[in-house]
């Protein structure tokens, strides 16, 4: 079972699951928030959130180590091993708390 912490929500799970599905198909690719938003809201219909919301959540997931960010100007992301471990229920809630808590 996945741990729940106050800063996480269903949008975070959907974003991580999207990246994990790509990886399970053999594609560990970097994506910016726009293609994640288009696919999650229009193609897959798993989210009803704005592109800005998806972008903010991806920044937060990267800050917490669940996504990895490259290219600081354009913001491309991919799932990390920690993100995969979260989806597999292999992390404790303490592993997901911000460093100051």
Question: Which role fits each region the language model picked out?
Answer:
Residues 82-101:
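Short, amphipathic alpha-helical interaction segments positioned at domain boundaries
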Residues 74-80:
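Minor-groove-contacting beta-hairpin "wing" of winged helix-turn-helix DNA-binding domains
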Residues 62-71:
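A short, conserved structural fragment
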């Amino acid at each position: 079972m996945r741990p729940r912490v106050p800063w996480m929500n269903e949008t975070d799970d959907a974003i991580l699951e999207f990246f994990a599905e790509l990886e399970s198909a053999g594609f560990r690719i970097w994506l910016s928030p726009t293609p994640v938003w288009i696919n999650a809201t229009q193609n897959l219909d798993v989210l009803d959130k704005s592109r800005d919301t998806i972008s903010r959540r991806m920044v937060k997931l990267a800050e917490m180590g669940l996504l990895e960010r490259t290219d600081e100007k354009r913001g491309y992301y991919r799932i990390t091993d920690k993100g995969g471990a979260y989806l597999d229920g292999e992390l404790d809630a303490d592993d997901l708390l911000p460093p100051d808590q």
